[in-house]
């Protein structure tokens, strides 16, 4: 069955889950829900902040989600709307029912969708406390767990958007639950976010590609029109329309594919990834990423703020983090796609991109002492097909800090590569996920870990792990960040230390059979992370202070620690996240290197 024949839920508004009082069609109700939000009732709900309860409401009006059986419209990767002949697509989300709570409202915890944070009791250990906090952060939709909010500080009167379920933030939470044997929340998250993928998303009359996954979503509880005693819960996604800078989240779809594969490998339940709607969702993401454009490089071209670093930090272009996630998602998707006639061209394009991307990153992004010396001696302005300095990099770009910082043993992938520009900053997530996904060779993977060990006082210090190194300072900070007061030197994304990166470090270390690196980092974190109330990030060069604007009880700081502990206890479980080096790619790369450049006849340019 081709992509155009598959039923995908799509509607112009928030998905409404109705009380028994409502018998209207689902799509009509959802559209009405969207109009109501923009017209009146939800304007006031947006202003609500902090936990709000409606005693007895949930007992009187039990939310009963309708199964998504009536969904008839589907969107293809090219944005065309197609009618499906299937009367009942049984790929529904409403088949899971677990009593619970829900968090709702943009910037607020809304209505019966939430209960006040319980009094925190002192746990018997750091790990016990982390599990307690993680479970408190769970969000429920119609009685079923669907994700975790970004931060759950009971003393925070202004949570902004930290009470939303962010796709990237939920990944370590989802992995923690998978490793614990609690699969339902991950399954629900995967399927509910899939339904959000095809919803209408516009900003200033422009719509992005149909495969885009949201950055986050909220569960709202709102009253039903015409019935004062009935309520409905709606999922309200944000595709970047409300984000700072209004940037679409490129990494959301890539993380979704990675989590989907991890769910299947950990739970053994392959029926989810084999569902027609899930297969279609994978294809839509791939079509969006593999679409032809003007770029000559196999890397994904993105704007600033499209990934974990979601503010202006000079990573526009081809940032390493996106390329590593892209490569990993391509491998995961190829593993999960079911063979069918309509997928042949997509699989072919996927394989070609894997080979080109692997070669490009390994060859041009890699720096160690030897490569740095080559760049230092580059000739410039080379006009030829066999130029050594293909991107016309000027040797003066090699910063003095790097000459002193690069160790004799070790290396890393630079942060970005564009014509006449190499971003030599070390970005932790991109390098670690290059190891996990086998985008880095075995030699390069060990060299990255060697560098982390060698530069432990810079990258780990008193709290793992620097998101990037070094920080932008002085005039460079003013020009590149726009004088961003949140990204001051050695703070937030500009050289801040993020505890959530513990789990990526652990997966990478275990994959290379060097778990002692992760164990040492976990030991450093345990000294103070619970005492400091699980901050989002740390400031200063050695991570001595809690970040100036750091949220406390940050969920992915909690989950990142838990995943690291779980994987160190059961190292074999790291296989649900890692990719083995692909023999076909290795053969293709070795063939390309042996073949070299063909000697061309003399040509004349007219």
UniProtKB/Swiss-Prot annotation:
Disulfide bonds: none annotated. Keywords: Carbohydrate metabolism, Chloroplast, Glycosidase, Hydrolase, Plastid, Transit peptide. InterPro entries: 6-hairpin_glycosidase_sf (IPR008928), 6hp_glycosidase-like_sf (IPR012341), Glyco_hydro_100 (IPR024746). The gene is NIN3. Belongs to the glycosyl hydrolase 100 family. The keyword Nuclease does not apply. Transmembrane segments: none annotated. The keyword Hydrolase applies. Its EC number is 3.2.1.26. Residues 1-58 form a transit peptide. It catalyses: Hydrolysis of terminal non-reducing beta-D-fructofuranoside residues in beta-D-fructofuranosides. GO terms for cellular component: chloroplast. One of its GO terms (molecular function) is endo-alpha-N-acetylgalactosaminidase activity. It is found in: Plastid, Chloroplast. GO terms for biological process: sucrose catabolic process. This is Neutral/alkaline invertase 3, chloroplastic. Residues 97-126 are annotated as: Disordered. Mitochondrial invertase that cleaves sucrose into glucose and fructose. It comes from Oryza sativa subsp. japonica (Rice). It is an enzyme of class 3 (hydrolase). It comes from the Eukaryota.
């Amino acid at each position: 069955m081709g992509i155009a024949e598959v039923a995908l839920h799509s509607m112009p508004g928030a998905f409404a889950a109705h009380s028994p009082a409502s018998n209207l069609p689902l799509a009509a109700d959802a559209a009405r829900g969207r109009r109501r939000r923009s017209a009146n009732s939800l304007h006031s709900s947006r202003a609500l902040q902090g936990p709000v309860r409606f005693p007895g409401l949930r007992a009187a009006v039990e939310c009963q989600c309708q199964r998504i059986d009536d969904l008839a419209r589907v969107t293809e990767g090219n944005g065309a709307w197609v009618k499906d002949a299937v009367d009942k697509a049984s790929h529904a989300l409403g088949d899971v029912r677990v009593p619970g709570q829900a968090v709702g409202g943009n910037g607020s915890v809304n209505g019966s969708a939430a209960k006040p944070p319980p009094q925190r009791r002192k746990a018997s250990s750091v790990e016990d406390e982390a599990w307690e906090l993680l479970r408190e952060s769970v969000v429920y939709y119609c009685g079923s767990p669907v994700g975790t909010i970004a931060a759950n500080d009971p003393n925070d009167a202004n949570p902004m958007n930290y009470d939303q379920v962010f796709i990237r933030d939920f990944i370590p939470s989802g992995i923690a639950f998978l490793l614990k044997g609690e699969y339902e929340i991950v399954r629900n998250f995967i399927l509910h976010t899939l339904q959000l993928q095809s919803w209408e998303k516009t900003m200033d009359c422009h719509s992005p590609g149909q495969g885009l996954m949201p950055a986050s979503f909220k569960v709202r509880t709102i009253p039903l029109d015409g019935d004062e005693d009935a309520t409905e819960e709606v999922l309200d996604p944000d595709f970047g329309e409300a984000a700072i800078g209004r940037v679409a989240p490129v990494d959301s779809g890539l993380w979704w594919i990675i989590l989907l594969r991890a769910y299947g490998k950990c739970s053994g339940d392959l029926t989810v990834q084999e569902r027609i709607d899930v297969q279609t969702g994978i294809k839509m993401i791939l079509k969006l990423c593999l679409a032809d454009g003007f770029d000559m490089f196999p890397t994904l071209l993105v704007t600033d703020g499209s990934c974990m670093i979601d503010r202006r930090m000079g990573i526009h272009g081809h940032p390493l983090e996106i390329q590593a996630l892209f490569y990993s998602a391509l491998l995961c998707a190829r593993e999960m796609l079911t063979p069918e006639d309509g997928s042949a061209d997509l699989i072919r394009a996927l394989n070609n991109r894997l080979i080109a991307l692997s070669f490009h990153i390994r060859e041009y992004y890699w720096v160690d002492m030897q490569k740095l010396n080559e760049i230092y001696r580059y000739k410039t302005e080379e006009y030829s097909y066999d130029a050594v300095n293909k991107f016309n990099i000027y040797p003066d770009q090699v910063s003095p800090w790097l000459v002193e910082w690069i160790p004799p043993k070790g290396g890393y992938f630079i942060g970005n590569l564009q014509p006449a520009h190499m971003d030599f900053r070390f970005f932790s997530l991109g390098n670690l996920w290059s190891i996990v996904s086998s985008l880095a060779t075995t030699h390069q993977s060990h060299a990255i870990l060697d560098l982390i060990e060698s530069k432990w006082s810079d990258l780990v210090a008193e709290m793992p792990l620097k998101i990037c190194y070094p920080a932008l300072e002085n005039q460079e900070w003013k020009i590149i960040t726009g004088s961003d007061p949140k990204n001051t030197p050695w703070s937030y994304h500009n050289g801040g230390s993020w505890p959530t990166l513990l789990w990526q470090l652990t997966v990478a270390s275990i994959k290379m059979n060097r778990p002692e690196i992760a164990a040492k980092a976990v030991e450093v974190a345990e000294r103070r992370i619970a005492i400091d109330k699980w901050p989002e990030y740390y400031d200063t060069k050695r991570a001595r202070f809690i970040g100036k604007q750091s949220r406390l009880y940050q969920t992915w700081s909690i989950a990142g620690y838990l995943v690291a502990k779980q994987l160190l206890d059961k190292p074999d479980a790291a296989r649900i996240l890692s990719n083995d080096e692909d023999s076909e790619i290795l053969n293709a790369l070795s063939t390309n290197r042996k073949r070299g450049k063909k000697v061309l006849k003399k040509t004349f340019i007219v």
